[in-house]
């Protein structure tokens, strides 16, 4: 696959992993390795200065070829997200920040207004900002305009496993964006990740579907293969749909004779 460029960074994998919900750290590390990912997201609250054995920042940073993308999960407004980003950069040394602002725990939908305000500040401060957003083409373009490194529209609600419920809006975002479009949240199966790539997404971020699988490393590998397949299919040129049948070979020419 072609390299993915986000800011000044390049990655060969188009699968990004979340690190929540895993039963234990060993399972998470095994899944990260099996996925071939090079970019993982981790919440600030997973940093533990006192107990380094339970500190995911250190655990993940020690893995070869892994770049950390801290996230602001838990922030309920722009001010909290900006503060979390500053602390995360100090602790991790990473310029990446995934802006997540979902103040209502009942549905965990991202707040578009607070997200925009936080992104405008953080992009101005030199962060590589990757916001988690509703599948809203207007918002996505506004975030591109203020300097975000990518946009991450949801496929469906966090952890719901409802797949690409917002596919139509994601297609519009892809069509209008000049920065990477990464589907985040709601993917349940590798086939859905493949479908996202066939649509033209730059990458996908997966957490729950891998973390809660009976065999997380095997599921991570399956997602990696699906992402590659979807990307290759899109690049190869997918057959257009037709409203009627089209013969794959001539229906009458075999009746013609020259003798």
UniProtKB/Swiss-Prot annotation:
InterPro entries noted in UniProt: Aldolase_TIM (IPR013785), Thiazole_synthase_ThiG (IPR033983), ThiG (IPR008867)
Active site, per annotation: 98 (schiff-base intermediate with dxp)
Principal localisation: cytoplasm
Extent of the signal sequence: none
Catalytic activity: [ThiS sulfur-carrier protein]-C-terminal-Gly-aminoethanethioate + 2-iminoacetate + 1-deoxy-D-xylulose 5-phosphate = [ThiS sulfur-carrier protein]-C-terminal Gly-Gly + 2-[(2R,5Z)-2-carboxy-4-methylthiazol-5(2H)-ylidene]ethyl phosphate + 2 H2O + H(+)
Binding site for 1-deoxy-D-xylulose 5-phosphate: 159, 185-186, 207-208
Pathway: Cofactor biosynthesis; thiamine diphosphate biosynthesis
Molecular function terms, GO-annotated: thiazole synthase activity
Alphabetical list of CDD domains matching this protein: ThiG
Pfam families attached to this UniProt entry: ThiG
Summary of the function given for this chain in its UniProt record: Catalyzes the rearrangement of 1-deoxy-D-xylulose 5-phosphate (DXP) to produce the thiazole phosphate moiety of thiamine. Sulfur is provided by the thiocarboxylate moiety of the carrier protein ThiS. In vitro, sulfur can be provided by H(2)S.
HAMAP family documented for this protein: ThiG
Protein name (database record): Thiazole synthase
Organism name: Chlorobium phaeobacteroides (strain BS1)
Originating gene: thiG
């Amino acid at each position: 696959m072609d390299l993915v460029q986000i800011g000044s960074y390049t990655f060969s994998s188009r699968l990004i992993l979340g690190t929540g919900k895993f039963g234990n750290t060993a399972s998470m590390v095994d899944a990260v390795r099996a996925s071939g990912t090079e970019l993982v997201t981790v919440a600030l609250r997973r940093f533990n200065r006192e107990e380094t054995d339970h500190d995911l920042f250190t655990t993940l940073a020690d893995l070869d070829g892994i770049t950390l993308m801290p996230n602001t999960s838990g922030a309920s407004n722009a001010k909290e997200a900006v503060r979390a980003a500053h602390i995360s950069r100090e602790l991790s040394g990473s310029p990446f920040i995934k802006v997540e602002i979902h103040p209502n725990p009942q549905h965990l939908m991202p707040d578009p207004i607070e997200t925009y305000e936080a992104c405008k500040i953080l992009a101005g401060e030199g962060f590589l900002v990757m916001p988690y957003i509703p599948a809203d083409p207007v918002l996505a373009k506004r975030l591109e305009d203020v300097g975000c490194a990518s946009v991450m529209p949801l496929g469906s609600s966090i952890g719901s496993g409802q797949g690409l419920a917002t596919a139509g809006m994601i297609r519009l975002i892809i069509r209008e964006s000049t920065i990477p479009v990464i589907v985040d949240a709601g993917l349940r199966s590798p086939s859905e990740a493949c479908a996202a790539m066939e649509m033209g997404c730059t990458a996908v971020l997966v957490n729950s579907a891998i973390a809660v699988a009976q065999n997380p490393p095997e599921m991570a590998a399956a997602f990696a293969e699906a992402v590659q397949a979807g990307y290759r299919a899109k690049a190869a040129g997918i057959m257009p749909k037709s409203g009627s049948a089209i013969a794959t070979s001539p229906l009458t020419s075999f009746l013609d004779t020259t003798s």
